[in-house]
Amino acid sequence: MVFGTGVDNVELSRIQKALTRSERFVEQVLTTMELEKYNNFQSTARKTEFLAGRWAAKEAFSKAYGTGFGKALGMHDLEIKNDELGKPYFSKHPFEGQVHLSISHSNLEAVAFVVLEKN
């Protein structure tokens, strides 16, 4: 049974502006493991795309979960990894059930869709 759905999109230019304003922005969004992957990318464009995708995915999860971000849920309560085929998934989350995630990018934006499913 579907518990919740969430979708979020973010313009890459908005993420780039946030990076320009604050070097700590990355650390506020990404977990230690995600930050290691981010730092391994060579190009600024790829880093921005990766960060935008993680931002959108975490925002989409917070909407599907029904709380948004605040006391009940923070960015670091969520962690995203990729399986052996490259498919992203939440490796860390507070939901007791299945979590489905899709992330897509274009030259201008990133979008993510999350479905939370209870057994």
From Swiss-Prot:
Family: Belongs to the P-Pant transferase superfamily. AcpS family.
Species: Lactococcus lactis subsp. cremoris (strain MG1363)
Catalysed reactions, as listed in the record: apo-[ACP] + CoA = holo-[ACP] + adenosine 3',5'-bisphosphate + H(+)
One GO cellular component term: cytoplasm
Residues that bind Mg(2+): D8, E59
Residues of the signal peptide: none
Sorted UniProt keywords: Cytoplasm, Fatty acid biosynthesis, Fatty acid metabolism, Lipid biosynthesis, Lipid metabolism, Magnesium, Metal-binding, Transferase
Protein name stated in the entry: Holo-[acyl-carrier-protein] synthase
Compartment(s): Cytoplasm
Biological process according to GO: fatty acid biosynthetic process
NCBIfam families: acpS, pantethn_trn
Enzyme Commission code: 2.7.8.7
GO MF term list: holo-[acyl-carrier-protein] synthase activity; magnesium ion binding
Enzyme class: transferase
Predominant cellular place of this UniProt entry's protein: cytoplasm
Reported function: Transfers the 4'-phosphopantetheine moiety from coenzyme A to a Ser of acyl-carrier-protein.
Essential cofactor(s): Mg(2+)
Pfam families linked to this entry: ACPS
